[in-house]
Regions:
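Terminal catalytic/cofactor-binding subdomain
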Residues: 1-112
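Histidine-centered divalent-metal-coordination microenvironment in nucleic-acid enzymes
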Residues: 114-118
Length: 118
């Protein structure tokens, strides 16, 4: 393949959040960056709709962040299809590990509802 490619996956979230508690998406983001330290959270605002602390870059070269109320995961730029599959699978694994570690796999469901490619 003579092209650099990557995927951006949006995850819809179904949850039983109660009023006054942090959102499930926020708790998962915090688990990724603060508890597990899988990457570095952004310390500066990236855009008008992406404030500081909204997400960050992962040590695998990808990016996880909250966009308009849903979690997104972007693979790093890749040169092969097998790398795209590996990094895309890594995003799903990170989410599954978060839910298992926080014992929320029965309370929260993430659904891959949109994939953009570039």
């Amino acid at each position: 393949m003579n092209r650099i490619v990557g995927l951006e996956t949006e995850y819809g979230c179904l949850t039983n959040d109660f009023p006054g508690t942090p959102s499930a998406i926020t708790r998962v983001r915090d688990w990724i960056f603060r508890d597990q330290r899988y990457g570095l959270i952004d310390v500066h605002q990236r855009d008008w709709d992406e404030p500081a602390g909204n997400g960050g870059f992962l040590f695998n070269g990808g990016r996880a962040y909250i966009d308009m109320g849903h979690l997104e995961y972007c693979t790093p730029e890749c040169l092969s299809l097998i790398d795209i599959l590996r990094y895309d699978s890594a995003g799903d694994t990170i989410l599954m590990n978060a839910l298992k570690s926080m014992r929320l796999e029965r309370e929260i469901n993430f659904i891959r509802n949109n994939i953009d490619h570039y």
